[in-house]
Design a protein with these regions (language model features):
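Compositionally biased terminal segments of proteins
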Residues: 1-230
Length: 230
């Protein structure tokens, strides 16, 4: 959200959602091989994860970036024989399928590993779909940044939360969205609930008044969204 008044804290991990429909006939294995052939990636601590070191050019130590591979839980990817990477397996998640509904194209300009200027175009999850993924995430793990990401999107989306809520309303028959709504209602039921308190934990403010304001703000942002979803 480059137009946001408050910048996002950023991220040092990349989630790649694998579309099984398009990755047939060995294309899934070919995708992994492209990364491995660069000799820049190695297996991470998780079975569905590669890691690579990125020099930000700021004079500091390189940052380790985690690249995680996800797929919808109800699809099957063609396995490569023999395996390209021992012990590697894609993480299947119920909400992953949502990201293929209406992805947005993002142009990314930078330098290749050989130093050439280049622009590539990526399909990324829309904000509405990103929120679905994050809602499911807070329903299954304790990672404060998930709740931060949800509230950041609700508070900073350029055209407001109404279009996001309208998108979710249009998916009322989709069980993945129904579950996402239920999770948000549970996790943001009050300022003292799991979601708002995760936001407080993420910001790590020292004084009680600031922490209370952060919790209240997170709660109200989620409640506004849920009231519009209906």
């Amino acid at each position: 959200m480059p137009e946001a008044a408050t910048p996002h804290v950023g991220s040092i991990d990349v989630d790649i959602a694998l579309d099984a429909v398009r990755l047939k006939a060995g294309r899934y294995a070919a995708l992994l091989k492209v990364l491995l052939d660069t000799r820049r990636y190695r297996q991470g601590s998780k079975s569905f994860q590669f890691v690579t070191d990125v020099d930000l050019g700021d004079g500091e130590k390189s940052v380790q970036v985690e690249v995680e591979f996800l797929a919808p839980s109800d699809v099957k990817l063609t396995k490569n024989r023999p395996k390209l990477f021992a012990g590697f397996r894609v993480l299947r998640t119920e909400a992953c399928g949502a990201v293929f509904r209406s992805p947005q194209e993002l142009a990314l300009t930078g330098k290749t590993i050989r130093g050439a200027d280049n622009t590539v175009r990526l399909h990324v999850a829309s904000v509405a779909e990103f929120l679905v993924m994050k809602a499911h995430a807070i329903g299954g793990r304790d990672k404060p940044k998930d709740s931060y990401d949800i509230c950041y999107c609700l508070e900073n989306y350029a055209v407001g939360i109404e279009p996001l809520a309208a998108d979710w309303r249009g998916q009322r028959a989709n069980k993945v969205y129904v579950k996402a709504v239920a999770i948000l209602k549970e996790k943001f039921a009050s300022p003292e609930a799991f979601g708002p308190q995760q936001v407080v934990e993420f910001h790590s403010a020292s004084d009680a008044e600031t922490r209370a304001m952060q919790a209240r703000r997170a709660y109200e942002a989620a409640q506004r969204f849920l009231s519009l979803v209906g």
